[in-house]
Amino acid sequence: MADPKYADLPGIARNEPDLYETSDLPEDDQAEFDAEELTSTSVEHIIVNPNAAYDKFKDKKVGTRCLDFSDRITKSKRTGYESGEYEILGEGLGIKETPQQKYQRLLHEVQELTQEVEKTQSTLKESATEEKLTPVALAKQVAALKQQLVSTHLEKLLGPDAAINLTDPDGALAKRLLTQLDAAKTRKDPEGKSSAKGPGPDNENLVTYELHCRPEQNKFSQAAKMAELEKRLGELEAAVRCDQDTQNPLTVGLQGSCLMDTVEILQAKVNLLDVASLDQVEARLQSVLGKMNEIAKHKATIEDADTESKVHQLYETVQKWDSMSITLPQVVQRLLTLKQLHEQAMQFGQLLTHLDTTQQMISNSLKDNTNALAMVQKAMKENLATVEDNFSSIDGRIKKLSK
């Protein structure tokens, strides 16, 4: 029972459910608030373009080979992520370098080697034992190697679009050749004597190209394209389940043929429908039609003879059945009687079996009773003899007591 001192307090809602209210928001709504934007000048605001970042780091991967970020207790530093100024391809990508990428990689490595040699040469002190390859000689060799790379003048050979065209060297050379041919067409022909004097300054800038045509390669590529086309057609037929109609005369002989053979067969069949050959086809069809009519007549005659023979056999069978149908009721009656006789014999056999079983049970019980009777008679004889002995002993005692 409630305490009576709280009965008449103001603000109490009677006959209503209890409600407990707090000034705080629920836990799910407490984290939902608008973060105040920082407007301080000390904070640097960096605008990040996700598309540009994606384009920059697309097809890149982080090399996790030989990395160790664990704590160290020795003075040697652990190996973490390494970053460089320029990298063509990462290790383990399995992608072959293009000529442009290989050229830029070699040029960059030569520049790094030059910087390292210059740094070593500036910081090297005189030592008692000099190495066979001094920094000065190494710097000369690096400069010669760089000059050799620059002498390849790939950009001069392939034009200003080498960075783009070197991904496809054959296409770049073909475009360059077409450009020089157009330039040669528009250039005026020199005089006849100038060609005999020797190569002029203009001829030094020309590049000689040799074009080699391989018919076998063209045939092989064409056959490969046809095989690829047949493969795609087979996959398409398997996808749509295009089954050939064996009854269609246009598809006869096309099973298992390649595409070219199929086209040739269809072309030969189309050529047969020429106007010049339609008369011959019509004459052949008329002769075939006459032969078909003769065959139909002979077939009808043969079918009529077969029908007559079958009807004659059926009539003979009916005649035989008439003589057998007279005796059929008697046979049925005899079978019914025989069925009843078999049922009675089966019942009699069951009764005999039951009687034999009962007789065996009675004989067994008689044997048991005979044995029990013999045992009872034997026990009675023994008991009778014992009683007689007891009576004789009692008579003797009585006689002794009477004396």
UniProtKB/Swiss-Prot annotation:
The keyword Ribosomal protein does not apply. InterPro entries: Dynamitin. It is a peripheral membrane protein. Keywords: Coiled coil, Cytoplasm, Cytoskeleton, Dynein, Membrane, Microtubule. Residues 99-132, 381-401 form a coiled coil. GO terms for cellular component: centrosome; cytoplasm; dynactin complex; dynein complex; membrane; microtubule; vesicle. It is found in: Cytoplasm, Cytoskeleton, Microtubule organizing center, Centrosome; Membrane; Cytoplasm, Cytoskeleton. Residues 184-194 have a biased composition (Basic and acidic residues). GO terms for biological process: mitotic spindle organization. Residues 1-26, 183-206 are annotated as: Disordered. Pfam families: Dynamitin (PF04912). Part of the dynactin complex that activates the molecular motor dynein for ultra-processive transport along microtubules. In the dynactin soulder domain, binds the ACTR1A filament and acts as a molecular ruler to determine the length. Modulates cytoplasmic dynein binding to an organelle, and plays a role in prometaphase chromosome alignment and spindle organization during mitosis. Involved in anchoring microtubules to centrosomes. Belongs to the dynactin subunit 2 family. Subunit of dynactin, a multiprotein complex part of a tripartite complex with dynein and a adapter, such as BICDL1, BICD2 or HOOK3. The dynactin complex is built around ACTR1A/ACTB filament and consists of an actin-related filament composed of a shoulder domain, a pointed end and a barbed end. Its length is defined by its flexible shoulder domain. The soulder is composed of 2 DCTN1 subunits, 4 DCTN2 and 2 DCTN3. This is Dynactin subunit 2-B. The lineage of its organism: Eukaryota, Metazoa, Chordata, Craniata, Vertebrata.
